[in-house]
Design a protein with these regions (language model features):
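Surface-exposed loop and turn segments in beta-propeller and other repeat-based domains
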Residues: 1, 33, 73-130, 202
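Blade-loop segments of beta-propeller domains
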Residues: 1-21, 26-44
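Structural signal for beta-propeller blades
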Residues: 19-21, 60-63, 154-157, 194-197
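Structural signature of eukaryotic scaffold interfaces centered on beta-propeller domains
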Residues: 1-6, 43-48, 127-142, 179-181
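Short loop/turn positions that demarcate and connect the beta-strands within blades
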Residues: 35-38, 127-129, 172-174
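Loop/turn-rich, solvent-exposed surfaces of beta-rich toroidal or solenoidal domains
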Residues: 1, 6, 178-202
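Conserved beta-strand positions in repeat-built beta-propeller and related beta-rich domains
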Residues: 6, 12-16, 54-59, 147-152, ...
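Short loop/turn segments that connect beta-strands within beta-propeller blades
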Residues: 23-27, 66-70, 160-164, 200-201
Length: 202
């Protein structure tokens, strides 16, 4: 679903649960993996071309990955930043077993999400709380924030990289996808409506 041209005539392709790196001769030279890589979507390079944003829709998350080492430099889970509980059944999701147990003691329905149980697809579509499906470094703010589309919520959000806090830039969309810079702003599709929107940079 994702493709990015890398330095030295290499390129990256996001598969379901991993990112494959190829050289100019189409030889696979590296594979980047993480437990919470699931149902991957877009991959976008940073301005310095040393890192990339990886959208893991299957686990309601976005990662920044070092291209050479595969190390995670930054991460964001919707579950930690207001996108909980799940609409389907009211269950609170977490990657922290102790947090799940605490919620359960409080009488809440909670699910400890262990990637070993769900694999490279992650949670099923209806089992996700947000389902981010595209993200981009905010080039208008020196990449200090990330803009992203949320499938379930129909939102365009801006994420503060320091805190993970979210500002909703646009809501009420019907399955938004593919936020990209356009001119001095942003272009995004509202897929089910068959239309697109342009947004100001701030």
């Amino acid at each position: 679903r994702g493709f990015a041209k890398l330095p030295n005539d290499m390129f990256a392709v996001s598969e379901i649960g991993r990112i494959s790196i190829f050289d100019s001769n189409l030889k696979q030279v590296n594979t980047l993996k993480h437990d919470f890589f699931g149902f991957l979507h877009t991959i976008i390079l940073s301005a310095g071309r040393e890192k990339m944003l990886v959208v893991s829709g299957g686990y309601d998350s976005i990662f920044e990955v070092d291209i050479k080492t595969g190390a995670i430099k930054w991460s964001w889970f919707g579950w930690d930043h207001g996108y909980n509980p799940r609409q389907q059944d009211g269950a609170f999701l977490t990657y922290d077993r102790r947090q799940a147990e605490t919620w359960q003691r409080q009488g809440k329905k909670a699910e400890f999400v262990a990637p070993q149980l769900y694999g490279k697809q992650g949670l099923v579509t209806a089992g996700r709380t947000t389902f981010p499906n595209s993200a981009y470094y905010n080039i208008y703010k020196d990449e200090s924030t990330i803009v992203a589309t949320l499938f379930h919520d129909g939102e365009i959000i801006e994420i503060d990289r320091e805190t993970g806090d979210v500002c909703v830039r646009l809501s009420g969309m019907n399955i938004p996808h593919s936020i990209l810079p356009l001119g001095d702003g942003w272009l995004v599709t509202s897929t089910r409506e068959g239309c697109f929107f342009t947004l100001s940079p701030t």
